[in-house]
Amino acid sequence: MMGKAYWMAGTCCCALCFVNPVHAQSGTTAGDGGQDIIVTATRREQRLQDVPLAVTALSADTLRTRGIENAADLGTGKVPGLAVNSLFGSEVSIALNMRGYGTSDASQGTQDQAVAFYLDGINLPRAQGMSLDLVTPERIEVLRGPQGQLFGRNAEAGAIQIVSKRPSGNLGGDLSAGYGNFNARFVKARVDLPEIAGFRVQLSGIYRQHDGYLDNVRNPLLENVRLYSSPLSSFHFPVANYDRDPGQLNSHGFRIAVERDFGKLNVFYTYDDSWARDDQGFSQFVTSPAAGTIFNPPGGNGPAFISNAAGTFTQAALDRGRYPTSVPFSFLYVPFINKGHGHMLNLALEANDNLTLKSITGIRQSLRYGGADIALSVSTFQPGSTEYLLSKTFSQELQAIYGTDGFNMTLGGIYFHETDKDERDSNLVTNCALPIPGTCDAASGQPTRPWYITSDKFKRQFSRTSAFAVYAQASYTPAILDDRLELTGGLRYSKDSKKARRTVLNGVTLATPQSNEARTDRFDPAFMAKFKLADDVNIYARYARGFRDGGANVRSVIFSAYQPETLDSYEFGLKSQWLVRRVTLNIAAFRNIVNNQQQSLQSNPSVDPSLTDTFNVQSKYKTTGIEVELSARPTPQLSLSVNYTYLHSNLRFVGIDKGTINSFALTNPTFNAQGALIPSAADIAAHPNASFIQLYPLGSPKHSGSIAADYWTPIGDYRLSAHLEWVRSGDMWVASPVRLVTNTTNGVALPNPYYVSPVSSNRVNGRITLGDIKFGGGVKGEIAFWGKNIFNHVDGSHAFGSGNALTPNMPQPMSSIYLQSPRTFGGDLRLTF
């Protein structure tokens, strides 16, 4: 792998990098008012409104105005059909869902995502929030629906493509710095150097940091100590203070881009390197509602708190009406370290006026290690986990793009290789309620050791993926109907192999490693028809199939392979502009059907919440939805935009055979008065000791959307602009379900009272900017003041089932929930030259 990296770097020193840049004109989704945005959603340049599929393009101005600084800021409701949630509250590790579908356990090291994430044509299998921070985006394209015919493996639900700004060859730059509450500060810079011997060079850098969102209780016993990690682990915690405020972030990185033309050959090379330290915050708890429903077990009206027997540590349930400002006891702060770097080489040759040949090569490495408290945040009995995930990828793609009047075709082939090293461990923090020697200070009752170990659960596994594919997509305009009809067909052949091997289980090196393999050998088609009703009014119909690779669950003790899944999508859409392109209205209606769905399931949350199993669901997952994008420019100075998504996904009930985690569909299940699932006597007899679960849809809020307004006015020689938006998302589930019904006896269901809370979002954001400030010497600037979550709404980002003791100190089924950020505000200064 290093040899390939050196080869690329050497090549770039000789002839550096990239195809002719695709220039998106300055505009925003909030109201481009007739300006054409050029996108490459079909691997060739097209006007956004002419692309026969659902695409949203966010320009650089839009990203800055809406405060989108990293992938996590895309947020649920900001883009139709896209749901984004931070895993366990992290700002760096995120999960992407598109049109009600994603990944049920996105933090697994070896499970592929359902939404592909691309940076300048290179697939990032582990989406990193820093990827957006390190580049100056020309635009972000969000493609909804299966994109496998052109964007490759694991784009079954959709794809996100970041297109960076190319080096200009002229001396210029963009420098921003800002400060906000929670001691937030950032500096971001991009400099284009003057062209030298035909080489155009761009340098970028970023530094971003903020303090924690909650005040921790300082504890000298958690300072200047070392957290436990297995002797077999590839990393060990340093001696440090582990009573820091939760919710902190510290990140920095740099990027270099070099471009040169050699006649008709364009060469573009980039290298980026990033580092970030984040944590997973402080988990609150919420209780199951008193009245049970089909989605949750019945709770109660008892006191909502958890505590140890002596009452030394007590935590009340989350108050949804008030954002917490502190934790109720000394909380163990456990950080994660994220490192990543990568090379990209893009060659483009204009063979003639109709044919362009491209080569896109990528080498990347990412590393994430650290730990977290999981389940309920009470120090008296708190599970914790550590993980180490090292991913190395290499990809090589070749493209031939041919176009004439009435006919366009893209041919391509791609090879992708990834190796993963994944280590995981589970342990417990200090438990002062139990007589464990050395864990508590007798006088204060405070913890004296951060973690102790009840049993060694350390696991180490390796995964190797090799994927090869060839694809073709062609569009043809027949000489009928005044050339208003365009027909498109695409086909992709994929041959993938994923091998997994476990060498350590529960702290013991295995004499014979566990191993499994998942293989894929398949064809996936796509068909589209577009008809132009008028110059600015198009309708289209689309069918596409996508798939996601199988693999092995690194969290599972069973370590059995799960198989690939497929998604069939049927879509009808309208793309239109009215009133001299002052009003844009796009509508898409779709139905997705997932077969052989990969589903993760918490194995035993009360013993070890980090353990999950993954299996293929035998019943189909179906989602029907409508997406609406409306933007208008009533006056040259005012832009308005609305987007709305409606999703309806089916609730399924399946059984899991004991020991094998093979699933089966239930026949004629019923429900009791509290909504608990009761399997039929026939299912119980046919599957003794099976577990029965209900699978709710993940990343599928029934309603989501946003309303935004942008206004500007001149003030002397300056330009004053304002942006205000309301982003709303209804309830959605984001974590693996638990077994809600177990141990059926004589046809009677005994509910297992676990509760998994949904999360939602309700945020108002704003920004006021004074621009066109001239500093002389060609330097211009702007000063902005901004606020996010202005009304300090309490919104969740991640939640999972964690408590069902039903004791006097824990009287109700409970769920752990990590919160989105509270109200943040600040100002920044931007200089351009």
Whereabouts are the PLM-identified features?
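N-terminal Sec signal peptide and the immediately downstream disordered periplasmic leader
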Residues: 1-77, 349, 831
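Transmembrane beta-barrel wall of Gram-negative outer-membrane proteins
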Residues: 172, 179-287, 339-345, 392, ...
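Membrane-embedded beta-barrel scaffold of Gram-negative outer-membrane proteins
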Residues: 346-350, 356-362, 367-372, 532, ...
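C-terminal beta-signal and adjacent terminal beta-strands/loops
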Residues: 637, 649, 716-719, 727-744, ...
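Outer-membrane beta-barrel domain signature, strongest for Gram-negative TonB-dependent receptors
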Residues: 237-244, 249-410, 416-419, 584-585
